[in-house]
């Protein structure tokens, strides 16, 4: 389709929405018309796309027949409100909210891992983007799985405040400023506890487990098509504004030397491998970048089948915007003509 695709971005004024517009332009995605959509209170705002200014429209007044592809990056409530109207109008929705992630007839896609499930995109005209933690984990693991197979995964994720939106980022900034000036913080704020210069575990819900940890396990099993996969996931709230970090223990089906694992990472898509005597950080290597950084690669002591590594990625640009755009690229290159 040489003239480009007409695209709507629901949640265009949010962090992921703005990063998605930037990513579409940077990767020269074939765009015909672009429609920036948000709630009524954001209508009329001006955004930049590809060197041009675009005006945000009220999603409630948008004619979905104008768009062929839509990126939904505004959360579950917005997805639930507009997905039926969009899909019934013939628009194909790439949804990042998690609302459809575990629906059996909706493809859940990490482009590097299971692009073949995109053949099912017409089941409901919806494709689900995994949580940014799942995308980060599987994008890093794909080269190792290809090299040595997969027996078991253990991952500890240190998540940034931006995972919970702008209010969380502002709350962390406010706490930090107060404490640096000797002012006590209000523990009734967004986090309910001091996060600045601190770490917070996540509490289990009524199901007896942590929602974010449960989502990683369920999504990884669905994407790898292995409901019995042994995977342990822990999530900790870190005092970082942007960028998630993961410490991963991967068990292969055969002995896999650390040097072999490093060679596999070098071949991985959108992976930057640190030198052996260096390591990546959220602040220095993740924030604002569209790639995954990996370091500290070594074998677990006395366990030649187990490889441990550290990864960092920008949850907004890599886990949010880039994953969605790469799904769209696969679609237009291989399935939509």
From Swiss-Prot:
Q: List the disulfide bonds.
A: none
Q: Write the signal peptide boundaries.
A: none
Say which domain of life the source belongs to. Answer: Bacteria
An example GO BP is: amino acid biosynthetic process
User: Can you name a GO cellular component term?
Assistant: cytosol
Entries under Gene3D superfamilies matching the protein:
Dihydrodipicolinate Reductase, domain 2, NAD(P)-binding Rossmann-like Domain
Q: Which InterPro entries does the record match to this protein?
A: NAD(P)-bd_dom_sf, Semialdehyde_DH_NAD-bd, Semialdhyde_DH_dimer_dom
Give GO MF terms, alphabetically: NAD binding; oxidoreductase activity, acting on the aldehyde or oxo group of donors, NAD or NADP as acceptor; protein dimerization activity
Q: Which PANTHER family match?
A: ASPARTATE-SEMIALDEHYDE DEHYDROGENASE (PTHR46278:SF2), DEHYDROGENASE, PUTATIVE-RELATED (PTHR46278)
Family listed:
Belongs to the aspartate-semialdehyde dehydrogenase family.
Name of this chain's protein: USG-1 protein
Organism per entry: Escherichia coli (strain K12)
From which lineage does this chain's organism come? Answer: Bacteria, Pseudomonadati, Pseudomonadota, Gammaproteobacteria, Enterobacterales
Q: Which gene encodes it?
A: usg
């Amino acid at each position: 389709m040489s003239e480009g695709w007409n695209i709507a971005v629901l949640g265009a004024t949010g962090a992921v929405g703005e990063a998605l517009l930037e990513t579409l332009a940077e990767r020269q995605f074939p765009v015909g018309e672009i429609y920036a959509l948000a709630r009524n209170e954001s209508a009329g705002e001006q955004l930049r796309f590809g060197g041009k200014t675009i005006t945000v429209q009220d999603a409630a007044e948008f004619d979905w027949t104008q768009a062929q592809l839509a990126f939904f990056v505004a959360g579950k409530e917005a997805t639930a409100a507009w997905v039926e109207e969009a899909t019934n109008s013939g628009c194909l929705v790439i949804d990042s909210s998690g609302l459809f992630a575990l629906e059996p007839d909706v493809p859940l896609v990490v482009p590097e891992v299971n692009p073949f499930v995109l053949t099912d995109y017409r089941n409901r005209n919806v494709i689900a983007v995994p949580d940014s933690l799942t995308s980060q984990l599987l994008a890093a693991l794909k080269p190792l799985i290809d090299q040595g197979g997969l027996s078991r995964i253990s991952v500890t994720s240190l998540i940034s405040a931006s995972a919970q939106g702008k209010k969380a980022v502002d709350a962390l900034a406010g706490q930090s400023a107060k404490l640096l000036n000797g002012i006590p913080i209000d523990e009734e704020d967004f986090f309910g506890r001091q996060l600045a210069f601190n770490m917070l575990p996540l509490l289990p819900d009524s199901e007896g487990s942590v929602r974010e940890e449960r989502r990683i396990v369920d999504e990884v099993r669905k994407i790898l098509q292995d409901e019995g996969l042994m995977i342990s996931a822990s999530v900790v709230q870190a005092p970082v504004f942007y960028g998630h970090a993961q410490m991963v223990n991967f068990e292969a089906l055969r002995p896999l030397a650390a040097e072999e694992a490093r060679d596999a990472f070098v071949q991985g898509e959108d992976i930057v491998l640190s030198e052996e005597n260096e390591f990546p950080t959220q602040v220095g290597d993740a924030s604002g970048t569209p790639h995954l950084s990996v370091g500290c690669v070594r074998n677990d002591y006395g366990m030649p089948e187990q490889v441990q590594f550290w990864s960092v990625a920008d949850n907004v640009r890599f886990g949010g915007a880039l994953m969605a755009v790469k799904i769209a690229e696969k679609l237009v290159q291989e399935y939509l003509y």
